[in-house]
């Protein structure tokens, strides 16, 4: 299966990461010698050569634009700038329907090790026919933000926990019970969203993901490696530490 374009969602304000995001968009937070966004761009270029890269920007978009101007003109990502953020579901739907391509969508607050990213791409490349793919990892039911239901590798549905459910203690049984949870990356097969009409300012999950799942065309790809959703100080500092180790291990230069 060929990925034609990559869309990195980086329009959010990163409110839970203040004061780090007072003067920087979340995707530009430093990771030692690189930053969150640049890490995703470099991995995309390395493991998916030839795929065009798009970045959705809004909050402090000028700083993201300035950052990508460091790339040579022929390799420079395209910016999808939204003065008034549309929300991930509408942005992704518009991009997929305008390009009519196989699109890899990545949340711009994700840190993947090189090994994890390469394994995901390998799973995509092994697909003989075009299909939609959701990257998922296993977590305890108590800690999971989303719960993915699958049958024989085909995703049936996804549900999101409410803020109340996330803060409540669910007890010992939920700590030991493992569930599949979304890892912040999805491949959307061409023409999958033609008749999908999302509301403004909503996330990809659950509505967009369930729309694709209802067609029985959404495969689960297991994420067993290092991946961090950077949405608070603890996760950010963990990503900084892991990024330093990853750069040494793979001798990467940014």
PLM-predicted stretches and their roles:
Residues 50, 100, 128-131, 216:
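Short, high-confidence coil segments that cap the C-terminus of an alpha-helix
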Residues 1-8, 16, 34-108, 112, ...:
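Conserved N-terminal catalytic core of the sugar/cofactor nucleotidyltransferase
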Residues 23-38:
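Short catalytic helix/loop segments, enriched in acidic residues and glycine
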Residues 30, 135, 148, 187-189, ...:
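Short, well-ordered beta-strand micro-motif
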Residues 59, 132-149:
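Short beta-strand-to-loop element that shapes/binds the nucleotide-sugar donor at the catalytic cleft/hinge
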Residues 104, 111, 118-125, 139, ...:
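Catalytic-core segments of class I nucleotidyltransferases/pyrophosphorylases
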Residues 6-11, 27-30:
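A conserved hydrophobic helix/loop-capping motif in glycosyltransferases and polysaccharide synthases
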Residues 56-58, 80-83, 134, 161, ...:
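Conserved beta-strand termini and adjacent loop/short-helix elements that scaffold enzyme active sites
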């Amino acid at each position: 299966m060929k990925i034609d374009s990559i869309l990195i969602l980086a329009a959010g304000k990163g409110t839970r990461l203040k004061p780090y995001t007072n003067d920087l968009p979340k995707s530009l937070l430093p990771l030692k010698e690189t930053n969150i966004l640049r890490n995703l761009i470099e991995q995309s270029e390395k493991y998916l050569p030839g795929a065009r890269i798009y970045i959705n920007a809004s909050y402090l978009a000028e700083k993201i634009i300035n950052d990508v101007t460091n790339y040579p003109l022929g390799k420079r990502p395209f910016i999808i700038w939204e003065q008034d953020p549309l929300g991930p579901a509408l942005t992704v739907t518009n991009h997929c329907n305008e390009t009519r391509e196989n699109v890899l969508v990545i949340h711009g607050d994700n840190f993947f090790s090189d090994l994890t990213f390469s394994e995901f791409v390998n799973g995509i490349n092994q697909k003989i026919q075009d299909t939609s793919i959701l990257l998922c990892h296993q977590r305890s039911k108590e800690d999971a933000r989303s719960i993915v239901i699958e049958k024989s590798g085909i995703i049936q549905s996804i549900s999101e926990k409410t803020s109340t459910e996330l803060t409540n203690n669910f007890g010992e049984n939920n700590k030991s019970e493992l569930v599949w949870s979304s890892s912040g990356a999805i491949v959307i097969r061409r023409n999958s969203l033609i008749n999908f009409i999302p509301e403004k300012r909503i996330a990809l999950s659950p509505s967009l993901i369930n729309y694709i799942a209802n067609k029985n065309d959404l495969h689960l790809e297991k994420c067993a490696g290092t991946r961090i959703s950077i949405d608070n100080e603890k996760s950010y500092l963990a990503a900084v530490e892991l990024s330093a180790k990853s750069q040494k291990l793979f001798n990467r230069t940014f």
